[in-house]
């Protein structure tokens, strides 16, 4: 009932534009002529589906036939020329790989040299603080190792002298 007060979808769009929608279609089907309408619609759907499916089936079969023909023609050529083509392809792949890697290593080297230059001139590039702290840690560890070596060296040589004194100064070999 509320639809009649505000108007239906058909009243807003206009009945002339879509004559077989909503209540009109329901009345048409109830009059007995609607079964013909739905059957013709089903036939149209089926015809469209058969046409689309058939054309796709034809296209896929043409693609398959084209692929088989291309392989039939290309396989003997590939077999005949494989002693030439395979080494040539390997050579080309190695050349491309070599040029790309040398270019990448060159860019990396330029970047490293630029960073070292900035660091040496005192510009403090990114990461230099980490390098300085690592250098300080390494220096302190090296100093600790040197001190321990001197301590154990003195202890070791001092220990032999103590043993020699207890034996009366005689060295045994």
UniProtKB/Swiss-Prot annotation:
It is a multi-pass membrane protein. Disulfide bonds: none annotated. This is Oleosin 18.5 kDa. The chain crosses the membrane at residues 54-74, 76-96, 97-117. Residues 158-167 have a biased composition (Basic and acidic residues). GO terms for cellular component: membrane; monolayer-surrounded lipid storage body. Belongs to the oleosin family. May have a structural role to stabilize the lipid body during desiccation of the seed by preventing coalescence of the oil. Probably interacts with both lipid and phospholipid moieties of lipid bodies. May also provide recognition signals for specific lipase anchorage in lipolysis during seedling growth. Pfam families: Oleosin (PF01277). Keywords: Lipid droplet, Membrane, Transmembrane, Transmembrane helix. GO terms for biological process: lipid storage; response to freezing; seed germination; seed oilbody biogenesis. The keyword Membrane applies. Residues 1-45 are annotated as: Polar. It comes from Arabidopsis thaliana.
């Amino acid at each position: 009932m509320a639809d009649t007060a505000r108007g239906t979808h058909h009243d807003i769009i206009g009945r002339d534009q879509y004559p077989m929608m909503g209540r009109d279609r329901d009345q048409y089907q109830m009059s007995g002529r609607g079964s013909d309408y739905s059957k013709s619609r089903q036939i149209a759907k089926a015809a469209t589906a058969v046409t689309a499916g058939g054309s796709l089936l034809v296209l896929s079969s043409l693609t398959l036939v084209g692929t088989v023909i291309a392989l039939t023609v290309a396989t003997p050529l590939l077999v005949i020329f494989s002693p030439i083509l395979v080494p040539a392809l390997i050579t080309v792949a190695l050349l491309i790989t070599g040029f790309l890697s040398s270019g990448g290593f060159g860019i990396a080297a330029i970047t490293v040299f630029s960073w070292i230059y900035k660091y040496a001139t005192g510009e403090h590039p990114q990461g230099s603080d980490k390098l300085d702290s690592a250098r300080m840690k390494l220096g302190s560890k090296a100093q600790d190792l040197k001190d321990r070596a001197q301590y154990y060296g003195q202890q070791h040589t001092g220990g032999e002298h103590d043993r020699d004194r207890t034996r009366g100064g005689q060295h045994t070999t």
